[in-house]
UniProtKB/Swiss-Prot annotation:
Cystine crosslinks: none
Origin organism lineage: Bacteria, Pseudomonadati, Pseudomonadota, Gammaproteobacteria, Enterobacterales
Organism of this sequence: Yersinia pestis
Protein name listed in UniProt: Glutamine--fructose-6-phosphate aminotransferase [isomerizing]
Function noted in UniProt: Catalyzes the first step in hexosamine metabolism, converting fructose-6P into glucosamine-6P using glutamine as a nitrogen source.
Domain SIS per the UniProt entry, residue ranges: 286-426, 458-599
Annotated Gene3D superfamilies: Glucose-6-phosphate isomerase like protein, domain 1 (3.40.50.10490), Glutamine Phosphoribosylpyrophosphate, subunit 1, domain 1 (3.60.20.10)
E.C. number: 2.6.1.16
């Protein structure tokens, strides 16, 4: 959600901070700010509501100098978007940036007011600045002071503290919100996402839960939650430096839709061989664990939840393993009964989704057979804290509305279904069929993308619409859910998805000539049932858009537009039918004039509850 960048260097670092914030814009924010200290201890703070370019313009006018600084993009949780609420927050010579939520900020605020502190914002972050300042009066180094402040805070946070009287160091602490150290030569950096620092380094140290770190130009000192000095591994980043460039595309989302064939190829690379699925990357003991699995519990949020819902059909119908899927924010706050030999699978593009991480940590106390993360970010908290991990290889995804991360999650899940099915004694043809279908998938999606202009023309029919229904059956029902999510995220059209068989249980009351109804209709065993549901909509004057297999026997008629799609193997149809819904949502958003890549009120990575 929010973004943090910090630097300790000999050179001027204002432009490094601003470029880092630019590269974090995809995470979602409403204001931005920075604070820079020069060698004489002079602090300059700039804050602006709106986009990073407004902050950049202000910085150019200031001609900022200084080798130590912190910067932040804010996504409002406490207090409206305003310059007063933007970070960094200061208390005399102390400056602080912070991601997360301090749950006990109200009693801390009252305590600090009683000590004579005056607050200039509505934020929870300002209490950190005043607490550090208060503790500094009691004595000790900045590192010692921050260590004393941390136990007073309840909630999730990643925070960086700077003292303008000593610009040689920054202190950072991580509890529930990610932070990464960028390792330079004679300079070091801090950020909430490695992407922010790729212009200046490719060497990173990912902080663990509870870590506190002191960063100077020449040293990085890390302390664990017990206060012990500890070494964390340094990792060479494999993220592409140009991942943040749109290239020839108008929006990141459009670029990422078109990158899906290559993203799927990359995800399959090295995992399909001689007609078999090779997941040896899981390690030598993984097969023994997977063979014991009698139940699968999937935990996810948002788009990842929809991919989990698709895989439930696959795990049960193809591998014969019972599977449940639950929203992470619900799972973590209820008492659950864990089935014998149950494998917990977590899904997250970023690997830092707060509720999913909390659910994983909770699961360790509940007796699961093991945990397996499916994630797009190597080195993320979810990957590090799980027993097993399978990486999607989608590359950096910038657009808030997930596209290639979703289809590569499904690709990995289908391979996992094939592997578990084989270990559980499924018919030998299952693995062959999955391999054959997945090998053909990138080319199938290329075919689909050639229909972009056709789908763009359809989008015109949504220009004056405020509501939409999506319908699907079987494993296409979660695809309808994903289509509805995409449309509401980026076009702000209220959209809902229903299993088509549920029409008579309520949704039919909404059908009229102003209600677009989008249907996904592959040529499978449920097609005739689906056709009956379509006729129910037609009989009530609904406006139908049917994405149908070319062999399904549909033709255009009054009130019903048919988009004929190439035939694909049933096993990969959910992945294939996702793409036209992504394109439809994208083009509708263009017509509506919304911010496609950074839709209002949303963030790419939800790192707070």
């Amino acid at each position: 959600m929010c973004g943090i960048v910090g630097a300790v260097a000999q050179r001027d670092i204002a432009e490094i901070l601003i470029e880092g914030l630019r590269r974090l814009e995809y995470r979602g924010y409403d204001s931005a700010g920075l604070a820079v200290v020069d060698s004489e201890g002079h602090l300059t703070r700039l804050r602006r509501v709106g986009k990073v370019h407004a902050l950049s313009d202000a910085a150019e006018k200031q001609d900022l100098h200084g080798g130590t600084g912190i910067a932040h993009t804010r996504w409002a949780t406490h207090g409206e978007p305003s310059e007063a609420n933007a970070h960094p927050h200061v208390s005399d010579y102390i400056s602080v940036v912070h991601n997360g939520i301090i749950e006990n900020h109200e009693p801390l605020r009252e305590l600090l007011i009683s000590r004579g502190y005056r607050f200039s914002s509505e934020t929870d972050t300002e209490v950190i600045a005043h607490l550090v300042h208060w503790e500094q009066q009691q004595g000790g180094s900045l590192l010692e002071v921050v260590k004393r402040v941390i136990p007073q805070l309840r909630g999730a946070y990643g925070t960086v503290v700077m003292d303008s009287r000593d610009p040689s160091r920054l202190i950072a602490a991580r509890s529930g919100s990610p932070l990464v150290i960028g390792c330079g030569v004679g300079e070091n950096f801090i950020a909430s996402d490695q992407l922010a620092l790729l212009p200046v380094t490719r060497r990173f140290i990912f902080l663990e839960e509870g870590d506190v770190v002191e960063v100077t130009r020449r040293s990085i000192s890390i302390f664990d939650k017990q206060g012990n000095a500890i070494e964390r591994p340094e990792i060479e980043s494999q993220v592409q430096y140009d991942a943040g460039d749109k290239g020839i595309y108008r929006h990141y989302m459009q670029k990422e839709i078109y990158e899906q064939p290559m993203a799927i190829k990359n995800t399959l690379e090295g995992r399909l061989s001689h007609g078999m699925i090779d997941l040896s990357e899981l390690g030598p003991k993984a097969d023994a664990l997977l063979a014991e699995v009698q139940h699968i519990q999937i935990i996810a949020c948002g788009t990842s939840y929809n991919s989990g819902m698709v895989s439930r059909y696959w795990f049960e119908s193809l591998a014969g393993v019972p599977c449940d899927v639950e929203i992470a924010s619900e799972f973590r706050y209820r008492k659950s009964a864990v089935r014998p030999n149950s494998l917990l699978i977590t899904l997250s593009q970023s690997g830092e989704t707060a509720d999913t991480l909390a659910a994983l940590r909770l699961s360790k106390e509940l007796g699961y057979l093991g945990s397996l993360a499916i994630c797009n970010v190597a080195g993320s908290s979810l990957v590090r804290e799980s027993d097993l991990a399978l990486m999607t290889k989608a590359g950096t995804e910038i657009g808030v509305a997930s596209t290639k991360a979703f289809t590569t999650q499904l690709t990995v899940l289908l391979m996992l279904v094939g592997r578990i099915g084989k270990l559980k004694g499924a018919d030998a043809s299952l693995e062959h069929d999955i391999v054959h279908a997945l090998q053909a998938l990138p080319a199938r999606i290329e075919q689909m993308l050639s229909l972009d202009k056709t789908i763009e023309a359809l989008a015109e029919g949504f220009s004056d619409k405020h509501h939409a229904l999506f319908l699907g059956r079987g494993d296409q029902y979660p695809i309808a859910m994903e289509g509805a999510l995409k449309l509401k995220e980026i076009s702000y059209i209220h959209a809902e998805a229903y299993a088509a068989g549920e029409l008579k249980h309520g949704p039919l009351a909404l059908i009229d000539a102003d209600m677009p109804v989008i249907v996904v209709a592959p040529n499978n065993e449920l097609l005739e049932k689906l056709k009956s549901n379509i006729e129910e909509v037609r009989a009530r004057g609904g406006l139908l858009y049917v994405f149908a297999d070319q062999d399904a026997g549909f033709t255009d008629s009054e009130g019903m537009k048919i988009i004929q799609l190439p035939h694909v193997e049933e096993i990969i149809a959910p992945i294939f039918y996702t793409v036209p819904l992504q394109l439809l949502s994208y083009h509708v958003a263009l017509i509506k004039g919304t911010d496609v890549d950074q839709p209002r009120n949303l963030a790419k990575s939800v790192t707070v509850e």
